[in-house]
UniProtKB/Swiss-Prot annotation:
Organism the protein comes from: Pseudomonas syringae pv. tomato (strain ATCC BAA-871 / DC3000)
Catalysed transformations (reactions): uridine(2552) in 23S rRNA + S-adenosyl-L-methionine = 2'-O-methyluridine(2552) in 23S rRNA + S-adenosyl-L-homocysteine + H(+)
Catalytic site: K161 (proton acceptor)
Taxonomy of the source species: Bacteria, Pseudomonadati, Pseudomonadota, Gammaproteobacteria, Pseudomonadales
Name of a matching Pfam family: FtsJ
Protein name as catalogued: Ribosomal RNA large subunit methyltransferase E
């Protein structure tokens, strides 16, 4: 079957992309690594020895960056519905995060450890229909926030990919109840046409200080 013009254009854009070329040169698995690196350069959210959870981790770009920054004394638990080639000292849990069984596996891996940072680059498969895509995206955001509320230590941080649209304002309001400081980030490595942004919430107050966000 011949490739469509749209498919051809996407491939050309992909391989002409400077961040794709940089990832190949620097040994990163995806251009997404540079989104996290840019946020890290500005906000210093990852430090040696931290315990971190990486949601939507495959193919592993964010996990590569995080693992290097937390070092040998740190701990990284990564999860994705897709397979991910192993990374030294990274615990990987494959499965659908919307299923309770996968949540329980992540919680079991965390154990009694208090987590310093939860990062999420999760996104649903996009149909191009906002009425379909936004509820799916917000559902993943709610589940990630629920996990963060369960595992973060007081003062911990939360970084998540979001798409502004129906449901975002309520979500943003919920997060502001749970964290001391909430900011939006749009890394230069995020494609211009993409509606994605990253919400950075710092200084977790603990569930006792705000309404709990229930898992759907």
């Amino acid at each position: 079957m011949a490739r469509s013009k749209t498919s051809h254009n996407w491939l050309k854009e992909h391989f002409d992309d400077k961040y794709v070329k940089m990832a190949q040169k620097d040994g990163y698995r995806s251009r997404a690594s540079y989104k996290l690196l840019e946020i890290q350069e500005k906000d210093k959210i990852i430090r040696p020895g931290m315990t971190v959870i990486d949601l939507g981790a495959a193919p592993g770009g964010w996990s590569q960056v995080t693992s290097r920054l937390i070092g040998g004394q740190g701990r990284l638990i990564a999860s994705d519905i897709l397979e991910m080639d192993s990374i030294p000292d990274v615990t990987f849990i494959q499965g659908d995060f919307t299923e309770d069984a996968i949540l329980e596996q992540i919680l079991e891996a965390v154990g009694n450890t208090q987590v310093d940072l939860v990062i999420s680059d999760m996104a649903p498969n996009m149909s191009g229909l906002s009425a379909v895509d936004m509820p799916r995206a917000m559902f993943l955001c709610e589940l990630a926030l629920d996990l963060a509320g369960r595992v973060l230590r007081p003062g911990g941080d939360f970084l998540i990919k979001v798409f502004q649209g129906e449901g975002f304002d309520i979500y943003h309001k919920d997060i502001r109840k749970l964290f001391d400081k909430v900011q939006m980030r749009k890394p230069s490595s995020s494609r211009d046409r993409s509606r994605e942004q990253y919400l950075l919430a710092r200084g977790f107050r603990g569930i006792d200080g705000a309404a709990s966000i229930e898992r759907f």
